[in-house]
A protein has these predicted regions:
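Extracytosolic ligand-binding ectodomains
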Residues: 2-18, 27-438
Length: 438
Protein backbone atom coordinates (compact mmCIF):
# COMPACT_ATOMS: atom_id res chain seq x y z
CA UNK A 1 0.00 0.00 0.00
CA UNK A 2 2.93 2.31 0.61
CA UNK A 3 3.54 4.68 -2.28
CA UNK A 4 0.00 4.33 -3.69
CA UNK A 5 -1.64 7.58 -4.79
CA UNK A 6 -5.36 8.27 -4.88
CA UNK A 7 -6.71 7.55 -8.35
CA UNK A 8 -8.59 10.03 -10.50
CA UNK A 9 -11.80 8.02 -10.09
CA UNK A 10 -11.48 8.03 -6.29
CA UNK A 11 -10.68 11.72 -6.23
CA UNK A 12 -13.72 12.52 -8.35
CA UNK A 13 -15.93 10.60 -5.92
CA UNK A 14 -14.84 12.80 -3.03
CA UNK A 15 -14.27 16.02 -4.93
CA UNK A 16 -17.28 17.80 -3.48
CA UNK A 17 -15.58 17.86 -0.12
CA UNK A 18 -12.38 19.19 -1.66
CA UNK A 19 -13.96 22.29 -3.15
CA UNK A 20 -13.02 25.15 -0.84
CA UNK A 21 -11.16 22.70 1.38
CA UNK A 22 -7.64 22.87 2.67
CA UNK A 23 -5.33 20.27 1.21
CA UNK A 24 -2.31 18.49 2.55
CA UNK A 25 0.73 19.46 0.50
CA UNK A 26 4.38 18.55 0.28
CA UNK A 27 3.80 14.85 -0.36
CA UNK A 28 4.37 14.74 -4.06
CA UNK A 29 1.43 14.13 -6.38
CA UNK A 30 -1.53 15.83 -4.74
CA UNK A 31 -5.25 15.98 -5.32
CA UNK A 32 -5.99 19.66 -6.15
CA UNK A 33 -5.35 19.32 -9.87
CA UNK A 34 -8.17 16.78 -9.98
CA UNK A 35 -10.80 19.04 -8.42
CA UNK A 36 -13.80 19.49 -10.74
CA UNK A 37 -16.13 22.46 -10.78
CA UNK A 38 -17.86 23.28 -7.51
CA UNK A 39 -21.22 22.32 -9.00
CA UNK A 40 -20.22 18.65 -9.29
CA UNK A 41 -22.15 16.37 -6.96
CA UNK A 42 -20.08 13.85 -4.98
CA UNK A 43 -21.03 10.22 -5.09
CA UNK A 44 -22.69 8.75 -2.02
CA UNK A 45 -20.10 6.90 0.07
CA UNK A 46 -20.37 3.14 -0.04
CA UNK A 47 -18.64 0.01 1.14
CA UNK A 48 -17.19 -0.79 4.54
CA UNK A 49 -17.24 2.18 6.89
CA UNK A 50 -14.01 3.72 8.06
CA UNK A 51 -14.35 3.71 11.85
CA UNK A 52 -12.77 6.59 13.76
CA UNK A 53 -12.47 6.13 17.51
CA UNK A 54 -13.22 9.29 19.46
CA UNK A 55 -11.78 9.49 22.99
CA UNK A 56 -14.03 12.17 24.47
CA UNK A 57 -14.19 13.93 27.84
CA UNK A 58 -17.96 13.55 28.34
CA UNK A 59 -17.58 13.64 32.11
CA UNK A 60 -15.01 14.89 34.60
CA UNK A 61 -13.17 18.19 34.62
CA UNK A 62 -13.05 18.38 30.82
CA UNK A 63 -16.78 17.90 30.24
CA UNK A 64 -17.40 21.45 28.96
CA UNK A 65 -14.76 20.93 26.31
CA UNK A 66 -15.89 17.38 25.65
CA UNK A 67 -19.44 18.39 24.82
CA UNK A 68 -18.26 20.83 22.17
CA UNK A 69 -15.54 18.50 20.90
CA UNK A 70 -18.21 15.86 20.32
CA UNK A 71 -20.57 18.31 18.66
CA UNK A 72 -17.78 19.41 16.33
CA UNK A 73 -16.75 15.84 15.54
CA UNK A 74 -20.31 14.90 14.63
CA UNK A 75 -20.60 17.96 12.39
CA UNK A 76 -17.35 17.13 10.59
CA UNK A 77 -18.34 13.51 10.03
CA UNK A 78 -21.76 14.59 8.78
CA UNK A 79 -20.11 16.88 6.24
CA UNK A 80 -17.76 14.12 5.14
CA UNK A 81 -20.59 11.67 4.59
CA UNK A 82 -22.54 14.28 2.63
CA UNK A 83 -19.57 14.87 0.36
CA UNK A 84 -18.25 11.44 -0.51
CA UNK A 85 -16.91 10.14 2.80
CA UNK A 86 -13.24 9.23 3.02
CA UNK A 87 -11.85 7.62 -0.14
CA UNK A 88 -15.46 6.94 -1.11
CA UNK A 89 -16.22 5.09 2.13
CA UNK A 90 -18.71 6.21 4.79
CA UNK A 91 -17.23 7.45 8.06
CA UNK A 92 -18.45 6.15 11.42
CA UNK A 93 -17.57 7.93 14.66
CA UNK A 94 -17.16 5.57 17.63
CA UNK A 95 -17.16 7.70 20.79
CA UNK A 96 -16.08 6.56 24.25
CA UNK A 97 -16.00 8.63 27.44
CA UNK A 98 -12.72 8.66 29.36
CA UNK A 99 -14.02 10.76 32.27
CA UNK A 100 -11.05 13.11 31.76
CA UNK A 101 -9.17 10.51 33.78
CA UNK A 102 -5.70 9.18 32.88
CA UNK A 103 -6.41 5.59 33.96
CA UNK A 104 -9.70 5.47 32.09
CA UNK A 105 -7.97 7.08 29.13
CA UNK A 106 -5.72 4.04 28.80
CA UNK A 107 -8.74 1.75 29.05
CA UNK A 108 -10.56 3.70 26.34
CA UNK A 109 -7.62 3.32 23.96
CA UNK A 110 -7.62 -0.42 24.59
CA UNK A 111 -11.38 -0.71 24.13
CA UNK A 112 -11.46 1.28 20.91
CA UNK A 113 -8.51 -0.57 19.40
CA UNK A 114 -9.18 -4.11 20.59
CA UNK A 115 -12.96 -4.34 20.93
CA UNK A 116 -14.39 -1.68 18.63
CA UNK A 117 -11.68 -2.38 16.02
CA UNK A 118 -11.47 1.25 14.94
CA UNK A 119 -9.09 2.40 12.24
CA UNK A 120 -7.77 5.43 14.16
CA UNK A 121 -8.21 7.10 17.55
CA UNK A 122 -8.37 10.86 18.00
CA UNK A 123 -9.68 13.75 20.04
CA UNK A 124 -8.02 13.67 23.47
CA UNK A 125 -7.61 17.10 25.11
CA UNK A 126 -6.31 17.07 28.69
CA UNK A 127 -2.57 16.54 28.72
CA UNK A 128 -2.52 14.23 31.74
CA UNK A 129 -4.84 11.87 29.84
CA UNK A 130 -2.77 12.10 26.66
CA UNK A 131 0.48 11.38 28.48
CA UNK A 132 -1.07 8.32 30.14
CA UNK A 133 -2.84 6.92 27.07
CA UNK A 134 -0.33 7.63 24.30
CA UNK A 135 2.15 4.91 25.30
CA UNK A 136 -0.65 2.32 25.12
CA UNK A 137 -1.60 3.50 21.64
CA UNK A 138 2.02 3.02 20.64
CA UNK A 139 2.07 -0.49 22.09
CA UNK A 140 -1.10 -1.33 20.17
CA UNK A 141 0.41 0.29 17.07
CA UNK A 142 -2.63 2.39 16.23
CA UNK A 143 -2.43 6.05 15.09
CA UNK A 144 -3.56 8.35 17.90
CA UNK A 145 -4.19 11.97 16.92
CA UNK A 146 -4.67 14.35 19.84
CA UNK A 147 -6.21 17.83 20.15
CA UNK A 148 -4.43 18.79 23.32
CA UNK A 149 -2.07 21.78 22.87
CA UNK A 150 0.51 20.26 25.19
CA UNK A 151 4.18 20.17 24.19
CA UNK A 152 4.28 16.47 25.00
CA UNK A 153 3.92 15.52 21.32
CA UNK A 154 6.61 17.81 19.85
CA UNK A 155 8.91 17.11 22.80
CA UNK A 156 9.58 13.63 21.45
CA UNK A 157 8.51 12.02 24.72
CA UNK A 158 5.69 9.98 23.17
CA UNK A 159 5.96 7.69 20.15
CA UNK A 160 5.67 7.56 16.39
CA UNK A 161 1.96 6.74 16.44
CA UNK A 162 1.03 10.02 18.14
CA UNK A 163 0.26 13.18 16.13
CA UNK A 164 -1.09 16.67 16.84
CA UNK A 165 -1.85 18.07 13.36
CA UNK A 166 -4.97 20.14 14.04
CA UNK A 167 -3.94 22.57 16.78
CA UNK A 168 -0.78 24.34 17.91
CA UNK A 169 1.06 23.54 21.12
CA UNK A 170 1.70 25.72 24.17
CA UNK A 171 5.36 26.25 23.36
CA UNK A 172 4.48 27.71 19.96
CA UNK A 173 1.64 29.78 21.39
CA UNK A 174 3.67 31.45 24.11
CA UNK A 175 6.73 31.89 21.88
CA UNK A 176 4.56 33.86 19.47
CA UNK A 177 2.80 35.88 22.19
CA UNK A 178 5.67 36.71 24.55
CA UNK A 179 7.07 39.63 22.50
CA UNK A 180 3.65 41.30 22.35
CA UNK A 181 3.06 40.85 26.09
CA UNK A 182 6.47 42.18 27.17
CA UNK A 183 6.35 45.06 24.71
CA UNK A 184 2.78 46.19 25.43
CA UNK A 185 1.97 45.17 29.00
CA UNK A 186 5.18 45.08 31.02
CA UNK A 187 8.25 43.09 31.96
CA UNK A 188 7.55 42.03 35.55
CA UNK A 189 5.17 39.10 35.26
CA UNK A 190 3.44 36.77 37.72
CA UNK A 191 2.18 33.48 36.31
CA UNK A 192 -0.94 31.74 37.67
CA UNK A 193 -1.41 28.30 36.11
CA UNK A 194 -2.89 24.82 36.72
CA UNK A 195 -0.66 22.40 38.59
CA UNK A 196 -0.26 19.72 35.90
CA UNK A 197 1.55 19.18 32.59
CA UNK A 198 -0.36 21.80 30.59
CA UNK A 199 0.40 24.43 33.21
CA UNK A 200 4.04 23.41 33.39
CA UNK A 201 4.38 23.99 29.64
CA UNK A 202 3.17 27.56 30.17
CA UNK A 203 5.49 28.03 33.14
CA UNK A 204 8.56 26.71 31.38
CA UNK A 205 8.16 28.07 27.87
CA UNK A 206 6.59 31.45 28.54
CA UNK A 207 8.99 32.02 31.41
CA UNK A 208 11.99 31.31 29.20
CA UNK A 209 10.65 33.41 26.32
CA UNK A 210 9.92 36.39 28.59
CA UNK A 211 13.41 36.26 30.08
CA UNK A 212 15.00 36.24 26.62
CA UNK A 213 13.07 39.43 25.90
CA UNK A 214 14.25 41.16 29.07
CA UNK A 215 11.24 40.21 31.17
CA UNK A 216 11.26 38.89 34.71
CA UNK A 217 9.01 36.25 36.26
CA UNK A 218 8.15 37.85 39.61
CA UNK A 219 6.28 34.84 41.00
CA UNK A 220 4.91 31.43 40.05
CA UNK A 221 1.50 30.46 41.44
CA UNK A 222 0.48 26.88 40.57
CA UNK A 223 -3.09 25.92 41.54
CA UNK A 224 -4.41 22.33 41.85
CA UNK A 225 -6.90 21.25 39.20
CA UNK A 226 -9.49 20.36 41.82
CA UNK A 227 -9.34 23.69 43.66
CA UNK A 228 -12.68 25.46 44.18
CA UNK A 229 -11.62 28.57 46.13
CA UNK A 230 -8.73 30.74 45.01
CA UNK A 231 -8.56 33.74 47.34
CA UNK A 232 -5.73 32.24 49.39
CA UNK A 233 -3.44 32.19 46.33
CA UNK A 234 -3.70 35.86 45.37
CA UNK A 235 -1.53 37.28 48.20
CA UNK A 236 1.37 35.44 46.54
CA UNK A 237 1.20 37.90 43.63
CA UNK A 238 3.76 40.69 44.32
CA UNK A 239 2.34 44.20 44.42
CA UNK A 240 4.94 45.47 41.95
CA UNK A 241 3.88 42.97 39.29
CA UNK A 242 3.20 44.62 35.92
CA UNK A 243 1.20 41.76 34.44
CA UNK A 244 -0.72 38.81 35.88
CA UNK A 245 -0.54 36.00 33.33
CA UNK A 246 -3.34 33.55 34.08
CA UNK A 247 -4.31 30.28 32.45
CA UNK A 248 -6.79 28.13 34.34
CA UNK A 249 -9.04 25.27 33.26
CA UNK A 250 -11.92 23.29 34.69
CA UNK A 251 -15.26 24.04 36.35
CA UNK A 252 -13.77 26.48 38.88
CA UNK A 253 -12.57 29.05 36.36
CA UNK A 254 -15.54 31.38 36.77
CA UNK A 255 -14.98 31.43 40.51
CA UNK A 256 -11.27 32.03 39.91
CA UNK A 257 -11.88 35.14 37.80
CA UNK A 258 -14.54 36.52 40.15
CA UNK A 259 -12.40 36.05 43.25
CA UNK A 260 -9.43 37.61 41.50
CA UNK A 261 -11.58 40.66 40.79
CA UNK A 262 -12.78 40.84 44.40
CA UNK A 263 -9.21 40.62 45.67
CA UNK A 264 -7.60 43.24 43.44
CA UNK A 265 -10.51 45.56 42.70
CA UNK A 266 -9.78 48.72 40.71
CA UNK A 267 -6.10 48.64 41.68
CA UNK A 268 -5.39 45.50 39.70
CA UNK A 269 -2.33 44.97 37.57
CA UNK A 270 -2.63 44.46 33.84
CA UNK A 271 -4.04 41.07 32.95
CA UNK A 272 -3.16 38.68 30.18
CA UNK A 273 -5.20 35.51 30.23
CA UNK A 274 -5.80 32.50 28.08
CA UNK A 275 -9.27 31.73 26.82
CA UNK A 276 -8.90 28.34 28.51
CA UNK A 277 -10.03 30.17 31.66
CA UNK A 278 -13.21 31.28 29.90
CA UNK A 279 -14.14 28.57 27.41
CA UNK A 280 -17.83 27.84 27.85
CA UNK A 281 -18.28 31.07 29.85
CA UNK A 282 -20.17 34.17 28.71
CA UNK A 283 -17.75 37.12 28.89
CA UNK A 284 -20.71 39.28 29.89
CA UNK A 285 -21.52 37.15 32.95
CA UNK A 286 -22.11 38.95 36.23
CA UNK A 287 -18.90 39.09 38.23
CA UNK A 288 -16.61 39.25 35.21
CA UNK A 289 -16.65 43.04 34.98
CA UNK A 290 -13.13 42.81 36.39
CA UNK A 291 -11.93 41.56 32.99
CA UNK A 292 -12.91 44.73 31.13
CA UNK A 293 -9.84 46.07 29.35
CA UNK A 294 -7.79 42.93 29.93
CA UNK A 295 -6.23 40.84 27.17
CA UNK A 296 -6.97 37.25 26.23
CA UNK A 297 -5.24 34.75 23.96
CA UNK A 298 -7.55 33.09 21.46
CA UNK A 299 -6.63 30.41 18.96
CA UNK A 300 -9.81 31.09 16.97
CA UNK A 301 -11.87 34.19 17.79
CA UNK A 302 -15.14 33.45 19.55
CA UNK A 303 -16.92 36.39 17.94
CA UNK A 304 -17.57 36.14 14.22
CA UNK A 305 -16.13 39.58 13.48
CA UNK A 306 -12.76 38.54 14.91
CA UNK A 307 -11.71 36.61 11.82
CA UNK A 308 -14.42 37.08 9.17
CA UNK A 309 -13.50 34.70 6.35
CA UNK A 310 -15.84 32.58 4.25
CA UNK A 311 -14.18 29.45 5.60
CA UNK A 312 -14.75 30.53 9.20
CA UNK A 313 -18.38 31.36 8.38
CA UNK A 314 -18.87 27.94 6.78
CA UNK A 315 -17.38 26.15 9.77
CA UNK A 316 -19.31 28.25 12.30
CA UNK A 317 -22.56 27.45 10.53
CA UNK A 318 -21.85 23.71 10.31
CA UNK A 319 -21.10 23.38 14.02
CA UNK A 320 -24.15 25.47 14.93
CA UNK A 321 -22.49 28.44 16.61
CA UNK A 322 -23.90 31.96 16.47
CA UNK A 323 -22.00 35.20 15.89
CA UNK A 324 -21.30 35.56 19.63
CA UNK A 325 -19.81 32.09 19.99
CA UNK A 326 -22.78 30.34 21.60
CA UNK A 327 -25.06 27.57 20.38
CA UNK A 328 -27.58 28.66 17.76
CA UNK A 329 -30.20 26.70 19.70
CA UNK A 330 -29.29 28.02 23.16
CA UNK A 331 -27.51 31.34 23.56
CA UNK A 332 -26.53 30.44 27.12
CA UNK A 333 -24.54 27.43 25.91
CA UNK A 334 -21.20 29.08 25.11
CA UNK A 335 -18.78 27.14 22.94
CA UNK A 336 -15.15 26.12 23.40
CA UNK A 337 -14.42 27.89 20.13
CA UNK A 338 -10.66 28.28 20.54
CA UNK A 339 -10.16 24.56 20.96
CA UNK A 340 -12.90 22.62 19.20
CA UNK A 341 -11.79 23.66 15.70
CA UNK A 342 -8.85 21.32 16.29
CA UNK A 343 -11.27 18.39 16.27
CA UNK A 344 -12.66 19.46 12.90
CA UNK A 345 -9.24 20.03 11.38
CA UNK A 346 -7.81 16.78 12.76
CA UNK A 347 -10.63 14.73 11.24
CA UNK A 348 -9.96 16.30 7.86
CA UNK A 349 -6.24 15.61 8.26
CA UNK A 350 -7.18 11.96 8.74
CA UNK A 351 -9.26 12.16 5.56
CA UNK A 352 -6.41 13.75 3.61
CA UNK A 353 -3.80 11.27 4.82
CA UNK A 354 -6.04 8.24 4.20
CA UNK A 355 -6.80 9.32 0.66
CA UNK A 356 -3.23 10.20 -0.23
CA UNK A 357 -1.66 7.12 1.39
CA UNK A 358 -4.12 4.59 0.00
CA UNK A 359 -4.95 3.34 3.51
CA UNK A 360 -7.63 0.63 3.50
CA UNK A 361 -7.61 -1.34 6.76
CA UNK A 362 -5.81 -1.66 10.12
CA UNK A 363 -2.48 -3.40 9.92
CA UNK A 364 1.26 -2.71 9.79
CA UNK A 365 1.44 -2.07 6.04
CA UNK A 366 -1.41 0.42 5.79
CA UNK A 367 -0.55 2.14 9.06
CA UNK A 368 3.00 2.63 7.83
CA UNK A 369 1.67 4.22 4.64
CA UNK A 370 -0.65 6.50 6.63
CA UNK A 371 2.04 7.59 9.10
CA UNK A 372 4.75 8.15 6.50
CA UNK A 373 2.34 10.12 4.31
CA UNK A 374 1.42 12.40 7.19
CA UNK A 375 5.07 12.81 8.17
CA UNK A 376 5.84 14.07 4.67
CA UNK A 377 3.17 16.77 4.90
CA UNK A 378 4.39 20.36 4.98
CA UNK A 379 1.25 22.52 4.94
CA UNK A 380 -2.46 22.29 5.62
CA UNK A 381 -3.94 25.05 3.50
CA UNK A 382 -6.64 27.33 4.85
CA UNK A 383 -10.09 26.35 3.62
CA UNK A 384 -13.32 24.70 4.74
CA UNK A 385 -11.28 21.85 6.16
CA UNK A 386 -8.84 24.15 7.94
CA UNK A 387 -10.90 27.26 8.78
CA UNK A 388 -8.66 28.57 11.57
CA UNK A 389 -5.94 29.27 9.04
CA UNK A 390 -3.09 27.57 7.24
CA UNK A 391 -0.80 25.34 9.29
CA UNK A 392 2.87 24.57 8.84
CA UNK A 393 3.39 20.90 9.68
CA UNK A 394 6.74 19.60 10.89
CA UNK A 395 6.76 15.88 10.22
CA UNK A 396 9.68 15.02 12.48
CA UNK A 397 7.78 16.59 15.42
CA UNK A 398 4.29 15.35 14.43
CA UNK A 399 3.13 18.89 15.26
CA UNK A 400 1.30 21.69 13.43
CA UNK A 401 2.18 25.39 13.73
CA UNK A 402 -0.29 28.20 13.12
CA UNK A 403 -1.22 31.76 14.00
CA UNK A 404 -2.46 33.11 17.35
CA UNK A 405 -4.84 35.94 18.24
CA UNK A 406 -4.77 38.52 21.04
CA UNK A 407 -8.18 39.91 21.96
CA UNK A 408 -9.18 42.61 24.43
CA UNK A 409 -12.34 42.59 26.54
CA UNK A 410 -14.25 45.64 25.32
CA UNK A 411 -17.83 46.31 26.43
CA UNK A 412 -18.18 42.70 27.63
CA UNK A 413 -17.07 41.27 24.29
CA UNK A 414 -13.80 40.02 22.83
CA UNK A 415 -12.23 42.27 20.21
CA UNK A 416 -9.23 41.01 18.23
CA UNK A 417 -6.33 43.48 18.45
CA UNK A 418 -3.38 41.42 17.17
CA UNK A 419 -2.62 38.31 15.14
CA UNK A 420 0.75 36.61 15.05
CA UNK A 421 2.51 35.07 12.07
CA UNK A 422 3.11 31.34 11.79
CA UNK A 423 6.87 31.82 11.98
CA UNK A 424 6.52 33.68 15.30
CA UNK A 425 5.73 30.40 17.01
CA UNK A 426 8.26 28.16 15.28
CA UNK A 427 11.04 26.75 17.44
CA UNK A 428 14.08 24.51 16.83
CA UNK A 429 13.00 20.85 16.80
CA UNK A 430 14.27 18.73 19.66
CA UNK A 431 12.95 15.41 18.40
CA UNK A 432 12.60 13.30 15.28
CA UNK A 433 9.85 10.70 15.38
CA UNK A 434 10.63 9.62 11.82
CA UNK A 435 13.71 7.81 13.12
CA UNK A 436 11.65 5.60 15.43
CA UNK A 437 10.64 2.13 14.22
CA UNK A 438 7.03 1.25 13.44
Amino acid sequence: MSGRRITRREAMKTAGALVGAGVLTGIGSTVPSLIPKASAQPAKPSGKALRVGFQVHRTGIGAIYGAWYERTANAAVKLMNETGGIAGRPVELVAEDDGTDPKRGVEVVEKLAQQAKVDFIFGTLFSNVVIAAAPRAGELKIPYLVVSEGYHVASGKLNRYIFQPGITDVRAQVSALAPWIVRNLGKRITMVYPDYAFGYDHRDFFGAAAKRLGGNIAALVPIPLTETSFTKYFPRIPRNTDVVYHVMVGPGVLTFVREMGEHFGARRQKLFGFIDSLEGVDIGSSGLEFLEGSYIWEAFPRYADGYPTRYEAFYRSRVGVNASGASQQDGKNVSAYSHMFGVWETLFVIKEAVEQSGYESPGPKDYRAFIETLERAEWFNEGNWHPQGSKRFVGRLHQAFGRQFVSQVQNKKLKVVFRTKIEDGMYPPEADYTKQPL
